[in-house]
Amino acid sequence: MLAAKCSESKCQLPETRGKQPGARSQRPAANDRQPETSDRPFIVPIFLPHAGCPHRCVFCDQSSITGVRAKQTPKDINDQIEAFLKFKTARRNKVQIAFFGGNFLGMPADEIKRLLAEAAGYVKTGRVNSIRFSTRPDTIDRQRLDLIKNLPVTTIELGVQSMDERVLSATKRGHSVPDTEKAIQHLKELNYEVGVQLMVGLPGDTPERLIASARRVARLKPDFIRIYPTVVLAGSPLAAGYRKGDYVPLSLDEAVSRTKHLFLLFKSKNIRVIRMGLQASQDLDNGSTILAGPYHPAFGHLVYSEIFLDMAVEQIESCARNADSISIRANPGNVSKLRGLRNRNIEILKKKFGFESVAVRPDDTLAEDQLKVSSKHRHSN
């Protein structure tokens, strides 16, 4: 039996976390290692379903997504903050209180100031570093930003969803593409960290419109992106359209594929994608709130797995197509992504190329943008 090694190949991988492509991992000796810390903040989420929203967008039912169905009292908020702070680990250097689920700057000024004052109290004591919130692009104006300019808000996420006017109209968003462009530009001029939330599979959207939207967002250079698949929530206006047959949601495979293309586009522009897929919850997982659509509790993992499958196929086709068996080595942090959920990628590779076996092995000398394939042949010419 002959064994062959493919020449070293660098593949563009999901997260290089600041490493130079192709650079090997620099690992200290075991007795020199220090506890690893993460640049990502520890998020303390406070959900304010539909707070400040001028109307209901067709896809939205924040109460179902967040599991929060009543207005949050000051005591509720303080209790949640205290509960979450108990779970902070030494790996997270920074802590952020985050207000999600509504249109934060669309709330009355007194409510905005009250909530931010509560959160700022934790910053003042040193237990929390900063505050973030999500809001609509059309709420970004000088008057509203004056409300928060002396408070420790560092990050603002915009519910953009699409950069196509036809899609925005079909989903009844009520804001325009210029609203988003002006909002991002204004926030960046004021040195806020800016995030953009996008959705795949919205009514009126197409693959071409989706990619065009992503390109327009990329040109605005936000700091990070979240990507969510559109699902039909039982309490959303979209549910009626789905029942009448006016709206057909994407399949899971379609949603994963479209999200993959967005991820790779943003990755090529050095824009972080910090989340893909809805946050798993008991309400979503038990199926009582979702009528249809591409919900999966490990949606992001499915996207990463498809990216790794593409990488493996490309390398196999270049140097191991006629092998009987192969071994693929990857950075330890990427082994599960390479295997795919329930070893799905392994089975796909075996079927596609007729391999007797596909072994996956961790290799901490490989950078996060590398795979190495070794092939075995029974016979040699």
Task: List the predicted regions and their residue ranges.
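Auxiliary Fe-S-binding modules of radical SAM enzymes
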Residues: 2-5, 38-42, 237, 244-381
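Arg/Gly-rich low-complexity intrinsically disordered repeat tracts
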Residues: 3-38
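Canonical Radical SAM [4Fe-4S] cluster-binding loop centered on the CxxxCxxC motif
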Residues: 39-76
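Short glycine-enriched loops at secondary-structure junctions
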Residues: 48-52, 228-233, 279
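Short acidic/His/Gly/Ser-rich catalytic and metal-binding motifs that mark active-site loops
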Residues: 53-57, 233-239, 284-286
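Conserved non-cysteine loop/helix-boundary elements of the Radical SAM core domain that shape
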Residues: 65-78, 87, 101-230, 234-254
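Short helix-terminating capping/connector loops at secondary-structure junctions
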Residues: 89-94, 125-128, 320-323
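Short acidic/polar active-site loop segments enriched in Thr and Asp
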Residues: 95, 129, 154, 223, ...
